[in-house]
């Protein structure tokens, strides 16, 4: 492929990458009745009369230019027609399985019935950001409910009871405490409910007749206790939940995280990754060689940016009917400018690195680390990272006039993140959306123009040419 970026105003000082991905999706994963459509009968009388699911073009507008179906090659701006939607279903399934952050984003629709499908369920989607200190944060310390330490279920309470005879507060009284099999004598007591001299008065044991100090305690000698095995179980369940959070809970991720086995995509009935590649987008400075009346002097810098790539293909033998889809996306390095590095917030001894504490649970990442405001919101938890993650990763940052808040900012020379409000660990945050509009001269136009060439070499069980009459020579 050859790619040209919309004209940058300046030769931006940042890294841009163009990446490609190819996947195959068996038709049976996106249409439940595909095998019956091909002639399979589970019972002798089963019907094989099925039609491929369709998606009607939106009324009035048809499929618009730049839509997903435009990239599939469907005619645009024409309504009142329909086409089969196996490509759209495969696209959404690939997104769900390979590009969606399962902790922050809901699955998109993947119809598997006989249709018709709704075109608005199938739109262009943004990939997730590459993982760094912030984008790899978890929204919770473990993926599951917090595991409680099993301390038992109950402990008897002494000092509360009900009397069955009449007493006053200066005399001792016989009372029945929780689950008691015999009466207990309170030397001093106070009434809580009921009247002195009345039956079934609720009584609280006191320390002396002349004061109101209460003598109410939980009797831990008779409390139920947890066993060592129950405590071990609590620790191991917590470890499982933490591994689910770190490793993911798609089935293939569970197998890899818990059992150390990487299962082929096809065996787990999911889209299969075939290959791809990554290459840099090169930004070329262009120096003005003559002065103009508009005030730009000689040597004023503009730029153009291009990228080319080769050998991003794949070789694959298919053993069933599949759709093959290729994806191209552009990403930039993630650079920050509004946060206070965690290292600059450390105050106590235990906040420093200690080997003995290296394997504790996930630690909180605070909002001020990515977006400092000088308010109470700074201490809101943004997400959770592994213990001492700040020692393992150093986010890139910018300073000086490159900062977006400088009155004479040069931020159009960079692609650094600039948050207009406090970011949260959410679907919007995790989507890859580099601020390319900030650095190009025409932000309302497409950011990249691509010329893609695919060299198909197919080996198929079909004759080279269809010759009339050769019906018995397949």
Give a label for each model feature.
Residues 1-474:
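Intrinsically disordered, low-complexity segments
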